Amino acid sequence: MRTHCCGELSLSVLNQTVCLCGWVDRRRDLGGLIFIDMRDFSGIVQVFFDPEQQALFEQASSLRNEFCIQITGKVKARPHHQINQKMLTGAVEVFSENLTIINCSEPLPLDRNQNNTEEQRLRYRYLDLRRPEMLARLKTRSKITSFVRQFLDKEGFLDVETPTLTKATPEGARDYLVPSRVQKGKFYALPQSPQLFKQLLMVSGVDRYYQIVKCFRDEDLRADRQPEFTQIDIETSFMTAQQVRTVTEKLIRQLWLQIKNIHLGAFPVMTFEEAIRRFGSDKPDLRNPLELVDLDDVLKNVDFKVFSEPANDAHSRVVGIRVPNGADISRKQIDEYTAFVHIYAARGLAWLKIKQADAGLEGIQSPIAKFLSPEILERILKRTQAKDGDLLFFGADKKKIVTDAMGALRLKLGLDRQLTQLDRWAPLWVIDFPMFSNDTETGLTAMHHPFTSPKNTNLSEFAANPETALANAYDMVINGYEVGGGSVRIHHSDLQQQVFSLIGIEANQQKQQFGFLLEALKYGAPPHAGIAFGLDRLVMLLTGTNNIRDVIAFPKTTAAACLMTDAPSFASDSSLQELFIDVVKKEKK
């Protein structure tokens, strides 16, 4: 139906007759002349209709935005003063010789100026995707997946598909369950990840596996989460954690070079402990220069219980954040920051402005100044490296509260004070995660997943101190986003059973849910390790959006609904009967 795409036209096809198909992006009537901007997936070109061709001109006058049309015409050079430098095709235009209206369009339910709610955009997604920036993101996504496949193929990885209908296993989030019509009363689960199958592929001798795969998690959603999402899933045999990091760092560095023409350089490596201590997060945004500074030892003996009590408690923490040139922050703004940390259960936010550092207590402004001695103030200023004109914020409470609250405050201050270098890329590896987290109600839970190997695989030593065990795990973080996470896996059945037992999975449950894995590990399972990257999150970063729904063609809302198709929907009684399912209506209290 066409010889060229709209965005391809240039002076190289001057005076050639072309046939184009696409949509009317805009029609302009200028002093008896009609011009349209014609758009397809490749771009926009200007089309001119000559009023001397009366029938064609009258036909063109009926065109409206988003009519689907076919144009045949000759490519002409625009007069020099009419060249549009903002368009790739701005040096040429098409003199129309024939117009076919393929399909008309009703007035759009979306605002052409893009002042649309997200609900409108999702309800009419097929129209929202016509916008050039949305199509550009889909093109970038396609380039990314194509590059990843080529890279991994060259590195000797084998693309293997794993089942979508599988067995429910506890992996952290709730499963999406699919009832079986054939097996009465039984359910499949949609995979939260191909974790167990890719480990079984290693037992099978596949050696190097990858898959770009859909995963499903029934969890509460955020701006960067979806109930169905896509992973770049990787697993290897006979490779160490360092070797996995090396090959996947190479992948990401080359990907950034391919898509953004940016050299990332070698990724720094940071332990989990250091990340939490300095940045209040296990996915630190290193574009932000602010850090959390521990002050426990400095404030242990201060005559101020808000500081001294947590400073002397092993389960608590006192930290400071130095805001360069922050003394101009108003009391109203300080109150707003105090309200902000309340979100994270912090009880308050102490502050101190440095007017003249070498003037001692006379040189500061702070409601806590009366509790500080000149010696303690000097130690605070030295530890935080505070200077004239700076502001210090203090957090003091249980470790988790302080870490979460001050870590979040650090990020907010970085943006508010324009300290975060938004034009930078700051990747890193975070390693040496705790093997388990300890919940007062549920006991030990796996920090990553229960198939991660501890760094120390000595069974007796591991069993003696599981709370202090480190996982042989690693996360890749870019600009504060965890883009990938992986680990060395357990490849001995007895160690796997021990980990299951530690997190409260009893022997019978182990056999019922993971018997196939425990059995497979007994048949010469090789050492293996892997990683998974969130494709949606990578595309989000590489296209410069902060909403993951912008990089998925047909995403769900935060209520896990598709507004366009009205999914999920009710099933008919006959369908439910076939599946042996009764829907029980909850009685109103």
From Swiss-Prot:
Binding residues for ATP: 217-219, 226, 482, 534-537
Any one GO CC term of the record: cytoplasm
Key words of the record: Aminoacyl-tRNA synthetase, ATP-binding, Cytoplasm, Ligase, Nucleotide-binding, Protein biosynthesis
PANTHER family tied to this protein: ASPARTATE--TRNA LIGASE, MITOCHONDRIAL, ASPARTYL/LYSYL-TRNA SYNTHETASE
A Pfam cross-reference name: tRNA-synt_2
Chief site of localization: cytoplasm
Gene3D superfamilies, per the entry: Bira Bifunctional Protein, Domain 2 (3.30.930.10), GAD-like domain (3.30.1360.30), Nucleic acid-binding proteins (2.40.50.140)
UniProt-recorded name of the protein: Aspartate--tRNA ligase
Domain of life: Bacteria
One term of GO molecular function: ATP binding
Keyword Zinc: no
